[in-house]
Every structure is written in structure tokens, then in C-alpha cells.
Amino acid sequence: EPKEKDGKLTAGLGAGGHWDPKDTKQHGYPWQDDAHLGDLPALTVLHDGTAANPVLAPRIKHLDDVRGHSLMIHAGGDNHSDHPAPL
């Protein structure tokens, strides 16, 4: 279900925050042990909206670990930082 922020309903907010079972409270690279497990590798999406290249998530060992969680795909790049700057 969507959640409200600043008076506007936003579908993505219903997914919750990054998956962070180790309680690191920081963003990082997918292979970095001291970052959210929810920080995944970049997904290459073509102009027609399809994504066919495999993505490896080296720190996720079992599919059961992510069962019941949402997968959010953001548009644009990622600088893997808690203090984003323009890319």
C-alpha cells in the first residue's frame, strides 16, 4: 500500500527502507560488508524497459533471505553513498 509523505501518497514508500539485517545504517557497494544488504548491483535496462543481463548479489546467499521483502528499482545512477552528490 502507498504511504504518505509531505501530504502526497507515494507507492514506493510502502516498501519500507533498505534491507539492513546487520543494522549498519549505511549505503555502500554490493560487495561491501559494512553496508545494507539491500544495496544491490546496478541493473542495466534498455530503452524499451527490458532488463536481460544477470545481476549478481554476492552477499545474498539464499532466496529465503529476501522472501517477504520488496525489490525497488530506481531510475538513474547510484553513487553508493549516504551523502548523494550529482553523478
Swiss-Prot record:
Destroys radicals which are normally produced within the cells and which are toxic to biological systems. Belongs to the Cu-Zn superoxide dismutase family. One of its GO terms (cellular component) is periplasmic space. It is an enzyme of class 1 (oxidoreductase). The lineage of its organism: Bacteria, Pseudomonadati, Pseudomonadota, Gammaproteobacteria, Pasteurellales. Gene3D superfamilies: Superoxide dismutase, copper/zinc binding domain. It is found in: Periplasm. Disulfide bonds: none annotated. Zn(2+) binds at residues 18, 27, 36, 39. The gene is sodC. Its main location: periplasm. This is Superoxide dismutase [Cu-Zn]. Transmembrane segments: none annotated. The keyword Protein biosynthesis does not apply. Cu cation binds at residues 18, 74. Pfam families: Sod_Cu (PF00080). It catalyses: 2 superoxide + 2 H(+) = H2O2 + O2. It comes from Aggregatibacter actinomycetemcomitans. Residues 1-33 are annotated as: Disordered. One of its GO terms (molecular function) is metal ion binding. Binds 1 copper ion per subunit. Keywords: Antioxidant, Copper, Metal-binding, Oxidoreductase, Periplasm, Zinc.
